[in-house]
Amino acid sequence: MRLLKKMSPELLVILDEYKKWFDQAVNFGHGRLKLPVDEKRIDGHTLASATSTEYLESVMKDSHRGIPEVALVTDFQYTSLVPVRFRNKSAELCDELLEFLGAKFNAVHVHYPTGGFMGWHSNWDCPGYNILMSHSPDGKGFFRYRDSVTKEIITMEDTIGWSCKVGYYGGKEESEDLHYWHCAGSDSPRQTLGFVIPHKEMWEMMIEEIEG
């Protein structure tokens, strides 16, 4: 996974307009709105435990399906009881980004509360070329992965504001060198949008659009 050095002004306008709406919506009225999370997916974990080397080793030994088995996030499309206005606004944003990028579908749009996480997983249930756009208000979030060749655990700290990472997630039947174990978390509110693109040429064209 590599971090893109820049994002196009046109793309940032789309993302910033959404973030402005989101911040106003969660801070409307008395106190900050607490978005719902799927309590069952937490499974007793914390940010520290779900992103630890010990947890990675345990997941790699079991019959992992590819998806995160533990998480503390709000998935705007799939978490129960997400307010309709947030679900609809997420869908609008994803549609606008799909049109901008020329992609066919997005894989995920999630909000991390303070202390939120997605535990170690491989995404080998949905292999392909990936684009991840994340927002951090203060750089206190991170993306962590295991280098499939060196076996080194590498942590990519968030930058302040929007950032974009791109890479490839291999399928379960592909070479182990293409398996991409990763996790993420944040000590402050964070959002991530993920896109999966099946064809390398299309993915490379989308990266050009993103970088402007």
Language-model features: locations:
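N-terminal auxiliary "cap/dimerization" subdomain that precedes the catalytic jelly-roll/cupin core
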Residues: 1-73, 78-80, 187, 200-212
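Nucleic-acid-interacting cores, centered on viral/eukaryotic replication and modification enzymes
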Residues: 1, 119-120, 135, 189-195
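Residues at the C-termini of beta-strands that transition into short coil/loop
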Residues: 7, 113, 196
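Residues that cap or initiate secondary-structure elements
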Residues: 11, 90, 126, 139, ...
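Extracellular-facing segments of soluble proteins and assemblies that are Gly/Ser/Thr-biased and enriched
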Residues: 67-131
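Catalytic core of non-heme Fe(II) oxygenases with the double-stranded beta-helix
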Residues: 102-175
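Serine/proline-rich low-complexity intrinsically disordered segments, especially terminal tails, linkers
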Residues: 51-54, 82, 138, 165
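Catalytic core of Fe(II)/2-oxoglutarate
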Residues: 144-212
